[in-house]
């Protein structure tokens, strides 16, 4: 494991005079200080709030912290911006002062990470840790930030013996999430000695939750739901086109504006439309240009984003690279972006200050159908409007449907002329369109968030976590079900599911029991549970077993290992859809050329999907594995080829994005490549790797790090309790000479792939694609057309087999590495006659190549 060095934001905290100031007010155990009483905790905390934070607490914040100090649970159902985070700080401080371990949980890793840094800043890095499945930082700290599932699994594994003194559960409305709600309910049922702070702006009626929590813990639950909204909201429904709505809001000074869309494509479409309307002043554009001066926009979407940012418009959605999302958030926090076009991810705790929220629709696609927004979804988004400390009110605008806007435009054009009014043909909603109107908007404004519907499930991993705790696991699982907030019918189904799981575990000899003297049973496991089971890579044990099926002597061994790893990773759906679309387009062209009729083409087209290497072998192996290892039934394999496809086609990140036209989803691709790198580096034993696989792993690391280093750093820096002085000792001394090439093996593969990709395109006779790759170093489309004509005048074809790709035909000269930060490379083309008289030669710019993730040349030529 790597030491967690204080880099970036964490390192800069040491220069902050307030760094760790709240943590310093807690008792110093090393000097023999004792716990302090609640009055002293209250006094120290609120003195710190006023002196260091410089704010005067609101009554509801004081009330909540007093309730927590009294030992009660608190449900904090207060509006966005009402200071829930301050209450959580008070809970963590009280726990630190009384020797209890406290947890902060959130639904997504980005929020957990953000809170981790916030808490480190006020409590000091020695007091705060983070666990997110693939990241463990200072995991023994007294304050832990983690995802909800981490805490739920710990609660099942340790029960009331868990070292969890108190928990702040943020975004608690996820309790009603059909897929993940179980993780918010389980701790409430299994940690009877733990104090809970449940927080959200959109909880609705929580009486049933409060009653259940009080019953399970025999502790009072205080509901605080009457806090006034710090910045009141005003609402408008408009029949103006979106561009005019934004223009009017800009003219009235109602910025910053967040334009909410329910698809990533729609967000970009609006941003492009607004870019020419002048939503920013000359001074704002100059400030933005200065702020982004050092930012490298190296990817296809990055160049689009750069152009939009310079006009004052930001983009924000989950398909972007993390570094681009962070940049937009930082610019917004500095007040530099008048307009941000994004998706409804705005509602999930993203720290972006907004004055006005413009909803482009009051409907969304929920994965199965279009439907109207629910009250909770609406308030989650609308509640982001209004900046505390800046605005006296926030503004929420809803756009009418497009057909209603067109009708209003026609009516306005007709004016009061009866003849013109009579001629107007009112447009209707398209067939099947789920529409809305001003009444829909008014109802959403007035509606309270729906009462949360609880969700529970029983899985093999949940049962095994209970078994690992020891004692009567079956009794505890039955009690978990009986104590849950589910309906009698749901409980009956959960008990039946538990019966199936326990029987399977017995039948496969995974668990056994021993009778106790009191008539009860002790459950225990006969096999070892994988480390971090069900938290990170639950199918890693299967992967290790399946690797035995491969022949290390096979020419495709390294690629087959990659396919096995890819089958255990979460699908990058946008990438796979693009692969399938391209495969079907190519198949359609071939079928038309073969003269197949329309119906037959359509039938065959449905059978074509994205590549799934080793699918039959993997599925057969997995079926057998699930019989022997029944907890694997909680998961499934998903064969696919993304990393393998990139290797086989010698693609770099930028080229792969262009090939499948997925610039808007480059963040999705990068996250997948990062997951693949971590799985390969962590899971595949060294004895199962050959030289080619090691090369590919190194290449993946270079690609991911060069595009967005945070995704590699997040994992590689995970691990540890090194203090600041130890971490600093690991950093290079001032003035120490840094290596020109950080990862020689990975960079070599990147360059070789880039050179051989050009050979592949020569074989396909693709001057357009070659010109797009090489126009910046003097070989555009026309130059490549002439080059290919000359080559094919001399040779019949280009070989692209293993011999053509071998190291014998790739020459690397590193002699100018230190003096000029350059490599001289030569890719000899394996022609049909074996003359080897043609070659692609270039001088690689090492610095730019390593920072951009694609090969950049100082000079370049293709000749014989």
Where are these regions (language model features)?
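Conserved segment of the helicase C-terminal RecA-like domain
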Residues: 356-359, 363-366, 371-416
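Conserved C-terminal RecA-like helicase domain
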Residues: 103-105, 113, 120-129, 264-339, ...
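Non-catalytic terminal extensions of ATP-dependent helicases
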Residues: 2-7, 12, 314, 333-334, ...
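Helicase-associated low-complexity/disordered flanking segments
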Residues: 1-74, 279-310
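Conserved P-loop/Walker A NTP-binding site and adjacent catalytic elements of P-loop NTPases
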Residues: 48-234, 238, 256-281, 316
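Conserved interdomain hinge at the start of the Helicase C-terminal
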Residues: 236-262, 269-272, 326-335
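Conserved two-lobed SF2 helicase motor
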Residues: 140-156, 311-325, 331-351
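A short beta-strand element within the Helicase C-terminal
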Residues: 164-167, 339-364, 393-399
